[in-house]
Structures are given as structure tokens and as C-alpha cells.
């Protein structure tokens, strides 16, 4: 492993940085520095604000002068994701952009952020390609294998406003999925608590468990095929892998779901297009614009692979 030592950096806190705890701010800023080291350099007084020592829970104020000392960090590996094709794939999928928001139609197979062996995700990519953006954060997340609407905030106050809307359930997201079998007309809601677990291989998996958090998902049949059903889905809660686990619980897993699907069922499906992606797509999002107060409705079209697969079905 290769390491490098950073130089001293001075940051003047602006309105997009205020009201954050210093430990959380540094964790975002110092990507390859362990959280334990961040706490250590705060506790030992190496991090200074306005030339004074601070505690990890100190909240940043506008005009604060933050001094970050030289820090030994792990060098980033060069990522194969920064290719022309990757760049084109993301930039051509921008659905909406203004001074406050960036909304894209995320392709399947691209993570929203780095981690777990992934060097770059959507957020890291846009930060690299747009270094002049002072602030850029994910408003919400969608699974790596799910395609569709993804919102990023370009101002901290926009992020906080949208997070408030999400907490108050004022943001509505809709999905479509192709599931195995004929979905019953009477099955319009699945309401089962979800619990995060970790398997022996450290992989995270979500299970239905009474000790878990409440989760509620609504379903509506869009079209039935011979062996599959296209369903419209509205999650009322935003739990990790909620839709994938609730469809499995209903006995109708999503096609080509490698974690929660049924491999034998996937193998039995005639796959003329050789598609191998999770057939789950975030089709639209409704929210109030954080600056203008305007009602927003953003729609993400299906990608060509999902669309072509549907065209092969009878």
C-alpha cells in the first residue's frame, strides 16, 4: 500500500458548510482517513478552528477558519470507471439541473457512492468532473443494480430542505419492476418489518423480522405476461432493499435479482436479449423545489436494455 502526506490546509466555512459537526465534516472531506484517526487528531488538538481546540461535536459556523494539519493517507487507486464511456453514460442521463439540484437517470450497475471495493460512484465521479462545485451531496440512494431517478443537491440548504421533505413523507417515488409469476389482483400492499443482518461472508442482507423497522410498499399491476408481471410500485417507507425483499415475500421475486431472487426461476425464463441486470427501475419522483417552492415531477425513461427485454415477452 502506498501512502502520502498531505500539506496543511485552511478552510473558511461558508453557508454550504455550516451547522455540521466537525467530525462528520472531516469524514466527508478526508475520504481515505479512518474515523478513528479523525477523532484522534481532534482530541489531540491538531484540528483547530479560529486557532482554538474543539470537540468532535462542535458545529461549524459561517466564517470559521478551519486548520487541518498534515495527515498521512492511503493513496487512491486509479479507477477504471473514469472512462469516456462512463462519463458519457452519466452526462447523457441528466434529467434536470439548476443552481440547486442535479437529477440523473442512474444506469444499472453503477453505485451511488464508493466503498466496499468500489473506487468511484456517482457522487465521487461528479465531484471529480466538476471540481468548481463547492457542494455536492446525495439527497437519497438507490441500489447499485437499480436504475432510475437519483437526486443530488448543489447547496446545503437544498439538501436539508429535501431531507426534511423525505422525513415528512412529502417526497413520493415510484418504481416499476418485472417480477416472476402472475401477481394477484388482490395483493395491493405488503407491510412487513425489515431487519438488517450480516452473513458470514460480511455481505449485508435484509430479512423480514418482527424486530425490524416498519416497511410498507404498494403495488399495482401494469401488465401481465405469460410467466411474469410488470408492476408499478410505490414505497411508503424508504428501507434498504425494501422493494426487493417485499416482492420476494409476496412470492414474486424480481427478475435477475442476484441477492433476493430465485436463480432457478431466472434460468427458466427465455432470455432472448441476454440481459442480466436487475429489472427494477425508479421511474419518477415528486417533491417541492427547495428554493422556488414549485411542485416538481421528474420522470426517468427506461433504458434500452429493460425496454428491449419487455418487447420480447408475450
Curated annotation (Swiss-Prot):
**In the UniProt record, does the keyword Amino-acid biosynthesis occur?**
no
Do you know which Gene3D superfamilies this protein is assigned to? Pseudouridine synthase (3.30.2350.10), RNA-binding S4 domain (3.10.290.10)
* Record-listed E.C. numbers: 5.4.99.24
Q: Which residues form a coiled coil?
A: none
Q: Keywords of this protein's UniProt record, alphabetized?
A: Isomerase, RNA-binding, rRNA processing
Cited InterPro entries: PsdUridine_synth_cat_dom_sf, PsdUridine_synth_RluA-like_CS, PsdUridine_synth_RluC/D, PsdUridine_synth_RsuA/RluA, RluA_PseudoU_synthase, S4_RNA-bd, S4_RNA-bd_sf
- Tell me the active site: 143
Which reaction is recorded as catalysed by this protein?
A: uridine(955/2504/2580) in 23S rRNA = pseudouridine(955/2504/2580) in 23S rRNA
Membrane-spanning ranges: none
Which molecular function term from Gene Ontology is one that the record holds? 23S rRNA pseudouridine(955/2504/2580) synthase activity
GO BP annotation list: enzyme-directed rRNA pseudouridine synthesis
Q: What range(s) does the S4 RNA-binding domain occupy?
A: 20-94
Instruction: Using the UniProt record, name the top-level EC class of this enzyme in a single word.
Output: isomerase
Q: Name one Pfam family in it.
A: PseudoU_synth_2
| Family listed | Belongs to the pseudouridine synthase RluA family.
What is its biological role? Responsible for synthesis of pseudouridine from uracil at positions 955, 2504 and 2580 in 23S ribosomal RNA.
Q: What is this protein called?
A: Ribosomal large subunit pseudouridine synthase C
Provide the gene name from the record: rluC
Amino acid at each position: 500500500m502506498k501512502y502520502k502526506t498531505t500539506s496543511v490546509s485552511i478552510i473558511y466555512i461558508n453557508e454550504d458548510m455550516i451547522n455540521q459537526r466537525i467530525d462528520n465534516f472531516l469524514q466527508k472531506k478526508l475520504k481515505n482517513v479512518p474515523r478513528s484517526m479523525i477523532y484522534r487528531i481532534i482530541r489531540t488538538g491538531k484540528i483547530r478552528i479560529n486557532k482554538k481546540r474543539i470537540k468532535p461535536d462542535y458545529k461549524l459556523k459561517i466564517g470559521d477558519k478551519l486548520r487541518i494539519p498534515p495527515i498521512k493517507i492511503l493513496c487512491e487507486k486509479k479507477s477504471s470507471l473514469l472512462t469516456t464511456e462512463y462519463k458519457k453514460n452519466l452526462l447523457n442521463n441528466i434529467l434536470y439541473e439548476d443552481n440547486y439540484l442535479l437529477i440523473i437517470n442512474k444506469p444499472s450497475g453503477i453505485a451511488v457512492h464508493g466503498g466496499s471495493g468500489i473506487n468511484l460512484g456517482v457522487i465521487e465521479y461528479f465531484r471529480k468532473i466538476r471540481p468548481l462545485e463547492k457542494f455536492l451531496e446525495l439527497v437519497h440512494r438507490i441500489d447499485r443494480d437499480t436504475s432510475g431517478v437519483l437526486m443530488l443537491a448543489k447547496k446545503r440548504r437544498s439538501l436539508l430542505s429535501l431531507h426534511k421533505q423525505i422525513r415528512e413523507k412529502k417526497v413520493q417515488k415510484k418504481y416499476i419492476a418485472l417480477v416472476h409469476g402472475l401477481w394477484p389482483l388482490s395483493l395491493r400492499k405488503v407491510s412487513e418489518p425489515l431487519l438488517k443482518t450480516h452473513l458470514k461472508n460480511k455481505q449485508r442482507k435484509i430479512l423480514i423480522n418482527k424486530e425490524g423497522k416498519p416497511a410498507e410498499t404498494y403495488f399495482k399491476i401494469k401488465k401481465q405476461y405469460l410467466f411474469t408481471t410488470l408492476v408499478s410500485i410505490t414505497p411508503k417507507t424508504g428501507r434498504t432493499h425494501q422493494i426487493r425483499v417485499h416482492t420476494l415475500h409476496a412470492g414474486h421475486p424480481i427478475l435477475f435479482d442476484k441477492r433476493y431472487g430465485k436463480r432457478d426461476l431466472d434460468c427458466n425464463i427465455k432470455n432472448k436479449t441476454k440481459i442480466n441486470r436487475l429489472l427494477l427501475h425508479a421511474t419518477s419522483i415528486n417533491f417541492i423545489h427547495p428554493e422556488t417552492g414549485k411542485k416538481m415531477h421528474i420522470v426517468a425513461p427506461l433504458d434500452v436494455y429493460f425496454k428491449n427485454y419487455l418487447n420480447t415477452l408475450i
